[in-house]
Amino acid sequence: MNTRMKIMLLPLWALLVAAWGACPAQDLLITEFMASNDDGLRDEEGESSDWIEVHNSGLEPVNLDGWYLTDSAANLRRWGFPPAIIAGGEFLVVFASGKDRRDPAGPLHTDFQLDADGEFLALVSPAGEIVHEYSPEYPEQQTDYSYGLGQSVTVFPMVGSQ
């Protein structure tokens, strides 16, 4: 391949690499959260902290290093994940306790708590792009009720069924 051809294909190659790298981002979602936890899930200290569930709906693992959770549209890089892997199909609970714990070997805690009256909540990629959000804010929350995405079910009728 001559030099001119290589130069012409370079932008296409860069575009393909960028698109491939962006694919896992679409697989991460905030699937559920609880902004007023009294009698629900407890953290490692036995406290009923608010929590956020992140789901990797894809097949490939995603390294969370450089990803962020935020409750502020003005500060998209509010709380950064440590270098941790979330496998394809896996769920990860992060406590929104204000304790700011990022040890990948232990439970994760954001440096903010969730507001039961409703607020902005987002998952942000290492590139600073919002991947999933509750915007402009999620609705007022009831104590001990989680909020999030519903589980989708597809029903296919059986051939010959009535």
Regions found by a protein language model. Name each.
Residues 1-6:
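N-terminal secretory signal peptides that target proteins for export/translocation
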Residues 9-19:
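Bacterial N-terminal signal peptides
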Residues 23-154:
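Activation on beta-sandwich/Ig-like modules and their edge loops
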Residues 155-162:
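A flexible loop/linker signature enriched in serine peptidases of the S9 family
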